[in-house]
C-alpha cells in the first residue's frame, strides 16, 4: 500500500492510522456509486467502521503493482485540516 501525501495529511488530521486503512480495505464495502474514472485511472471508495467506530471512506487507486491511498474521509465528523 502506497499512501499519497494528501492521504497522509488527511489521516493525520482525522486521527486515522495505517492499521485502520488496512482494516477498511479488508472488511469495508465498495461504494459503487462513487467509483470514478479519469485519465489517471479508476478510484475505488471503500467504506466501513474502524475498530474505534469511525465511519470512514478510504479512496484507493490501483497503480502498477501497488495500491495507492488517495484520500481518507470521516463520514460523520468534519475535521479541521490544512492539507494542500
Which positions does each model-derived feature cover?
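Ribonuclease/tRNase effector modules and their secretory precursors
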Residues: 1-84
Amino acid at each position: 500500500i502506497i499512501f499519497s501525501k494528501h492521504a497522509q495529511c488527511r489521516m493525520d488530521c482525522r486521527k486515522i492510522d495505517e492499521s485502520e486503512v488496512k482494516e477498511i480495505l479488508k472488511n469495508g464495502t465498495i461504494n459503487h456509486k462513487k467509483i470514478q474514472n479519469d485519465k489517471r485511472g479508476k478510484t475505488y471508495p471503500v467504506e466501513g467502521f474502524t475498530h474505534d467506530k469511525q465511519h470512514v471512506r478510504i479512496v484507493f487507486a490501483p497503480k502498477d503493482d501497488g495500491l495507492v491511498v488517495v484520500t481518507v474521509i470521516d463520514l460523520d465528523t468534519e475535521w479541521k485540516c490544512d492539507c494542500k
